[in-house]
């Protein structure tokens, strides 16, 4: 079953999914905060709080920069005005997680290129059985993401190459 949000200029007043019908919501939603009503946000928060699964894919980290609970769900996000006030820029350096509080905007990516993904947590049910390192096909490598990062475990990272407008850090690629 698929629930699709109304188009860009569509009417969101009738968009009221029954989240409880789903074990997991997979989202690539990227639009301004104002489109979701407070009641729609509250129903989604309740769904997740009650154990509903939520997978934020690709541009879903751009959505809802002002929605505190959403940002707690995704851990880190980019664009749409996020900056140091949104939370630290999390990355790995010398094998350690760095919550960098330096000022700056959130969200960047270079040109689409293949990149190596490193699974840092190999005993998690999501990464168990996967190779420690593997190549991802050409794609945008999101970097410089910021957010509260509370209760966030970074399972995999990717080197954000400065030669491709990257940060020069091991950026989070897969988080739970």
List where the protein language model places each region.
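Aromatic-Pro/Gly-enriched surface loop or interdomain linker
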Residues: 1-22
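Structural recognition of the beta-strand scaffold that forms the well-ordered cores
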Residues: 2-5, 23-28, 48, 53-58, ...
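Solvent-exposed loop/turn segments at secondary-structure junctions
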Residues: 8-12, 30-35, 54, 60-64, ...
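Extracellular/periplasmic catalytic domains that process cell-envelope and extracellular macromolecules
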Residues: 17-21, 48-50, 64, 146-149, ...
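Catalytic beta-strand/loop cores that center a nucleophilic Ser/Cys/Thr
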Residues: 89-176
């Amino acid at each position: 079953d698929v629930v699709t949000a109304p188009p860009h200029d569509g009417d969101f007043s009738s968009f009221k999914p029954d989240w409880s019908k789903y074990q997991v919501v997979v989202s690539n939603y990227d639009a301004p905060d104002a489109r979701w009503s407070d009641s729609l946000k509250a129903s989604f928060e309740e769904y997740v709080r009650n154990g509903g699964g939520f997978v934020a894919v690709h541009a879903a980290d751009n959505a809802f920069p002002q929605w505190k609970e959403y940002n707690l769900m995704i851990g880190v996000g980019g664009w749409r005005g996020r900056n140091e006030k949104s939370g630290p820029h999390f990355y790995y350096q010398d094998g350690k997680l760095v919550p960098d509080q330096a000022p700056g905007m959130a969200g960047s990516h270079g040109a689409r290129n293949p990149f190596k993904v490193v699974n840092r947590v190999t005993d998690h049910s999501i990464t168990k059985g996967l190779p420690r390192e593997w190549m991802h096909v050409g794609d945008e490598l999101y970097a410089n993401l910021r957010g509260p990062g509370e209760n966030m475990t970074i399972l995999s990272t990717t080197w954000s190459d400065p030669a491709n407008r990257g940060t020069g850090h091991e950026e989070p690629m897969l988080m739970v």
